[in-house]
């Protein structure tokens, strides 16, 4: 659920430390706390560990998921042209390769012809992206 009261809160935003904890657990690591999850993220190259409570954008989340996949030995060479999305110019240079991979793998498909890369990554987005990654 993620919250003490058992709620998932799908519309809540995803923070960096939440992402680090989930990805660390997915890798088989069992961090005892957020500080250990942060260190795991740094050690694996998923993140530089900055701004743990910072809210993630969709492109930031997908970039860290891409780095996670790479750190796990997943072939991340798939790519799709982003120019078919009306807001492709809004994709940050650091995130282009990751979003291209995520689009090619069906992890992200956009909505109404847009990727919304700068939009807030909700917990629902994270759950969908992670499901598609795990089952793709």
Locate each region found by the language model:
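Feature responds to low-complexity, polar/acidic, surface-exposed segments characteristic
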Residues: 1-60, 65-95, 109-121, 132-136
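Phosphate/pyrophosphate-binding loop motifs in nucleotide- or prenyl diphosphate-using proteins
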Residues: 106
């Amino acid at each position: 659920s993620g919250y003490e009261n058992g709620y998932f809160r799908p519309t809540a935003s995803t923070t960096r430390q939440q992402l680090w904890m989930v990805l660390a657990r997915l890798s088989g690591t069992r961090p005892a706390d957020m500080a250990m999850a942060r260190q795991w993220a740094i050690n694996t190259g998923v993140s530089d560990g900055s701004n743990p409570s910072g809210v993630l954008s969709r492109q930031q989340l997908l970039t860290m998921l891409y780095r996670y996949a790479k750190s796990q030995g997943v072939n991340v060479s798939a790519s799709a042209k982003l120019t078919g999305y009306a807001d492709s110019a809004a994709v940050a240079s650091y995130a282009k390769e990751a979003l291209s991979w995520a689009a090619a793998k069906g992890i992200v498909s956009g909505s109404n012809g847009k990727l919304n890369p700068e939009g807030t990554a909700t917990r629902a987005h994270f759950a969908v992206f992670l499901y598609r990654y795990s089952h793709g």
